Structure formats: structure tokens, C-alpha cells
Amino acid sequence: MKKILAEIAYDGSLYYGFQIQPTKPTIQGEIEKALEKISKTKVKVHSAGRTDKGVHARGQIISFYIRINIKLKNLKTAINSLLRKDIRIIKLKYVADEFQPRFNAKRRKYSYYILNNENHYPWEGYQAYYVKKKLNINRLNEMAKMLIGIHDFTTFSCIKDQTNSKLKKIYFARFKKKNKLIIFEIIGSSFLWKMVRSIVGTIIDIEIKNEPVYTFKKILNSKNRKFTRTTAPAKALFLDKVFYE
């Protein structure tokens, strides 16, 4: 029996996050059900990260064992045929038994989509956070640069987050403009629960209120949750890629 790595993509709109819940639809639950139909036995899926309710992924990584002999291309086809169209297996490969999607990950990349144009089609806001006021991308990037390096992100953590250390290393953070969208891209060692959404919500709030950009640095350095601003909605957040090198 070999361990298999799967790269998966999903639209999280109709799911209560990645992690399995007994009475609610989740990404993990749907994938495990499909694998169990194929293998006729219980299958446990492990992931690189547990995305929240409503969050999407282009490059989530999972691993599992399956107790049947089947070519990977046939297994991929079989799994996708049993999944809803909003969850897709992108690729499969064999990995060593020691491989752990979460603990072997070196970095993770997230993107957050902001719709910043009043003249848009209704569906353009389905997976983007609509902000009516014109945002100054230079000011946004001044604040994004303050994230680079190792920081205590207690300010941008959720009270329910039980992680012992709030220290995280951020390698890259920037806002870029693409047509009607402003896209925030961030790469870090790992992230706290709702951390990216809290960062985005706080930066946008400071920009909308035209506060000095150093306000963001003061909020970050406060290490106090009460100073965080709005938590941006989940529907605009994507887990893009997990890096293992």
C-alpha cells in the first residue's frame, strides 16, 4: 500500500471549510466519501492546511493511502467522477510514507481578490470583496511591505486560535492591479486562523479612512486583537500553492 499525494482545487462557497464535520458538507468529507466508494474501505485524508468556510483553493495538497491496485490516472478519473464539480483532483503522485502535507510544507501562498470598480457585472463579485472607494495601490503596498520578515501576528489572530506561537515569517506580500481587481498576494511559512483576512480587512479600513500608513505598523506591533479592524469576507480568499522546497 503506497501513500499518494494529491493536488486539489475547489470552490469553497458551499462548504463549511476543509476539515470534516459530522453533519455539515466539507471538502475533506466529500473526498473521503469518494475514496471510500472506490476502495470499499475507510480512508483518512490529511491536508497541508484547513481552509475556513467559504475559502477556495487552487493548490491544496492532501495525502492518503488506498488499498487497491489502480493506475494513478485511472484513480484520478474515478475520484473526479464521484466528486461534485466544485472539487477537482488536479494531479496525483506517489510519496514516501514519511511525507506529511502539513508538517513538510515550507511555505504557503494565498491570494485575496478585491473588486475595486463600480462598473462591474454582478457575477464578478461572487469570489471577490467589493470595495466601492477607489483604493490607492501605492499606499496599500506601503502597508504590505511592513509584513515582510518575522513578526508576532497576535493582532491578526482569532481568539479561537489555540496556536502556541503567533510568530510567523512572511517572505512576500504585495497588492497588484489586474483590470477591475486588486489582488493581494502573500507567501509565508504558515498562517494563523483568519490571519490573511484580518490583515486585508485592516489595510483596507486604514486606506478607506485615509489614515497614515504607519497606523498599520502600530496595529501590527501592538500584539493586541482589539486593535484589528474588519475581517475581510472569506469568499475572496484562495490558497494558491504549497511549497515543499
From Swiss-Prot:
InterPro entries on file: PsdUridine_synth_cat_dom_sf (IPR020103), PsdUridine_synth_TruA (IPR001406), PsdUridine_synth_TruA_a/b_dom (IPR020097), PsdUridine_synth_TruA_C (IPR020095), TruA/RsuA/RluB/E/F_N (IPR020094)
Keywords: Isomerase, tRNA processing
Catalytic reaction equation(s): uridine(38/39/40) in tRNA = pseudouridine(38/39/40) in tRNA
Coiled coil feature spans: none
UniProt-listed Enzyme Commission number(s): 5.4.99.12
Pfam families registered for this protein in UniProt: PseudoU_synth_1
Function according to Swiss-Prot or TrEMBL: Formation of pseudouridine at positions 38, 39 and 40 in the anticodon stem and loop of transfer RNAs.
Name recorded for this polypeptide: tRNA pseudouridine synthase A
Phylogenetic classification of the source organism: Bacteria, Pseudomonadati, Spirochaetota, Spirochaetia, Spirochaetales
